[in-house]
């Protein structure tokens, strides 16, 4: 009898806890349901705050709902040293140290997906240690002009090579609980006037040259 009562009490306790757990905090629920439930609980101000930065590399959370801030860091070839809250100056922390990895141009030149996996794993470990939620990388824009000062951040002019190399990087990075943010958007292939230029190209060029690496990053890498 006592064993039955103990089991019944435990069952009731578990049921009570389950009933009290909001859908958005229940890992067993579909992600769509969790997002919908979380949004339904937020004020307009809280929703707006989630859509833009609160500092150079962080977005606000919703403390009353237990939703934490989101902390990001550059970049494709190493976690960035900490910078000030509202400007690009370095914070000069005395305990701040990171590894400067070879640029992604060098990684792509190996033609070695296993090396890319090790690269992503190592960066992911450092990002997790630094308590980052999102790493802004890898960079997979295709080389269009040699005058792009950020070409070194990308994986070359071959869409197939970039597609193959970015996937293991992302997979291993994200095993550390750090999300990959692939950059810098498809067709953002030059720095000069990058926020203003009008990109003209055919669908064939888009799908055969500039989009494959981004597609592989999302569909195969899970970014």
Language-model segments: which ranges?
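Bacterial Sec-dependent N-terminal signal peptides
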Residues: 1-21
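Glycoside hydrolase catalytic-domain context in secreted enzymes
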Residues: 19-223
């Amino acid at each position: 009898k006592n064993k039955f009562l103990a089991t019944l009490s435990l069952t009731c306790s578990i049921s009570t806890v389950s009933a009290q757990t909001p859908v958005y905090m229940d890992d067993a629920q579909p992600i769509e349901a969790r997002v919908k439930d979380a949004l339904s609980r937020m004020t307009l101000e809280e929703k707006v705050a989630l859509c833009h930065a609160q500092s150079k590399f962080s977005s606000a959370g919703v403390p009353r709902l237990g939703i934490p801030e989101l902390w990001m860091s550059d970049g494709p070839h190493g976690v960035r040293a900490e910078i000030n809250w509202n400007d690009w100056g370095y914070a000069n922390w005395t305990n701040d140290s990171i590894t400067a990895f070879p640029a992604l141009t060098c990684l792509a030149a190996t033609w070695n997906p296993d090396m890319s996996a090790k690269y992503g794993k190592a960066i992911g470990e450092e990002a997790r240690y630094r308590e980052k939620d999102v790493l802004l990388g890898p960079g997979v824009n295709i080389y269009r002009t040699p005058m792009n000062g950020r070409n070194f951040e990308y994986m070359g002019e071959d869409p197939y090579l970039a597609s193959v190399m970015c996937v293991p990087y992302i997979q291993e990075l994200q095993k550390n609980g750090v999300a990959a943010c692939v950059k810098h958007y498809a067709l953002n292939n030059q720095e000069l006037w990058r926020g203003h230029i009008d990109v003209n190209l055919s669908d064939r060029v888009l799908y055969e040259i500039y989009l494959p690496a981004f597609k592989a990053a999302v569909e195969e890498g899970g970014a």
